[in-house]
Amino acid sequence: MSERIFIGVAWPYANSQLHLGHVAGAYLPADIFARYHRTRGDEVLMVSGSDMHGTPITIRAEQEGITAAEVAERYHQRFMASWPKLGISWDFYTSTATANHARTAQEMFLSLYEKGYIYKNTVCQPFCSHCNRFLPDRYVEGTCPHCKYEGARGDQCDNCGKPLNAAELLNFRCKNCGNPPEFRETEHFFLKLSAFEEELIRWVETKTHWRTNVLNFTLRYLKEGLKDRAITRDLDWGVPLPLPGYEGKRLYVWFEAVIGYLSASKEWAASKGQPNAWQKYWGVDTKSYYFIGKDNIPFHTIIWPAMLMGKGGLNLPYDVPSNEYLTTESQKFSKSRNNAIWVDDVLSRYGVDTLRYLLSANMPESSDTDFSWREFVRRNNDELVATYGNLAQRVLTMVCRNYDNKVPEYGELDERSLTLIEKTAAMLCETDKALYNCNFREAIRLAMALAQEANRYLDEKAPWKEIKVDKAAAARSLYVAMVALSGLRVAFYPFLPESSGRLSTYLGFGSELEKEGWILKMPVVGQELTPPEPLFKKLEDSVVEEETARMGL
């Protein structure tokens, strides 16, 4: 039975390029999940967009001496160019700079305000007398009071993931000039998170299918007690407050950006000429998944659900399969600290499926994982080239050369051959279960294990020897290996769409796997075949030294 799946994916700040940490953390797992569900025949809407507001953009604009709008648009266009290179299959990708988004965010604000979930309060905020202005969140840096990380910001600690405010930081300073700010009174609007504490605890305690790290982090945070949080800032860049007399204030980006999932859904529906079509993806009969990095967990498991509870009539998240951090040399990738491997740079030298494979096999699902160029080369050469790619190349080349470029007759199969076919069908069932439960590393491991089993079968049968004495026996062995390849093209498709599409074509099925379903299709005897090209290219060992040198390591 088909399902309806909504996939919301973290909105990247439009202040720098995409790096591998972003891809492994949110965008690749979301794309894998979307492709899998489409192949199953489910209704899928996967949305995201560029976060054009917030202090990361204004900080960069000030550094470059241009407007925040210019910075945001530059990187939004770069993101738009990067997604196809990565094979990210958005149903809709937009930005927070649209009139539709501003309207949707303001409607959410007014709804919560009118229901008493947003209120005004006078608070002390950091003010830099040297720069003569209030300092919103990321304009203040200091030491985290919880984990003592010295690079924490006035909105959050990237090291331990806890949301903060500037007053909590130790040894705080203005990011712009380095001087310690003073605190002055200013009026802001607050989201009454405390009103949702008990309801959120009851709701989260039902989420036993969540990843352990996400569930434990959320429950621990909730049971410490929720504090009301300011949702406005003294800025001139962002979504204006929809109330008179507050022209100098904007909606705080953490409140505004999560509303993007809703505004993007509405914009998608309008683009289809069906302005109400978004509603079915926000009803109770839809499963909503939010793919994010671990620094965004509380915003998606606590704050966004609280906003949805307050608004009413909108579906709460079913799952928030947050990943941990991808590191390099045990350091977190960071745009703001310029410690990263940039996506466009990597893809200018290596195939997209090679990158997607390593990031999938090494995905930081339950703990931080380290990106290594040595591992990148090893997995490409040993697993993609020597195992999976070699299986496809030698089977299809032998078939095309010896059976007139057609799928051969195979006759009666022996027990060993039937066992491999059964294992292929079982692998598809097992990967289906793993993917359904967002266990991506397990799914790709199962697929590669089947490729290894198919190679063992081929080595046992040795059709290159059989063909010299019994062409019919060789045909049986090669046909069974083609069945295994047919299963592998499906299992690998969510992870490696480019090579899976080519393999599918070489097997005579065509390249549109999503239309076929998550099933094992048997190659059709007599089907014309195209001689294959290698699915993957071997990398030289020198790549390790070259790439580490580029990183300055």
From Swiss-Prot:
Catalysed reactions, semicolon-separated: tRNA(Met) + L-methionine + ATP = L-methionyl-tRNA(Met) + AMP + diphosphate
Broad class of where this protein is predominantly found: cytoplasm
Keyword Ion transport assigned: no
BP GO annotations: methionyl-tRNA aminoacylation
Annotated residues for binding of ATP: K335
Positions annotated to bind Zn(2+): C144, C147, C157, C160
The protein's role, per its UniProt record: Is required not only for elongation of protein synthesis but also for the initiation of all mRNA translation through initiator tRNA(fMet) aminoacylation.
Protein name: Methionine--tRNA ligase
Biological source species: Dehalococcoides mccartyi (strain ATCC BAA-2100 / JCM 16839 / KCTC 5957 / BAV1)
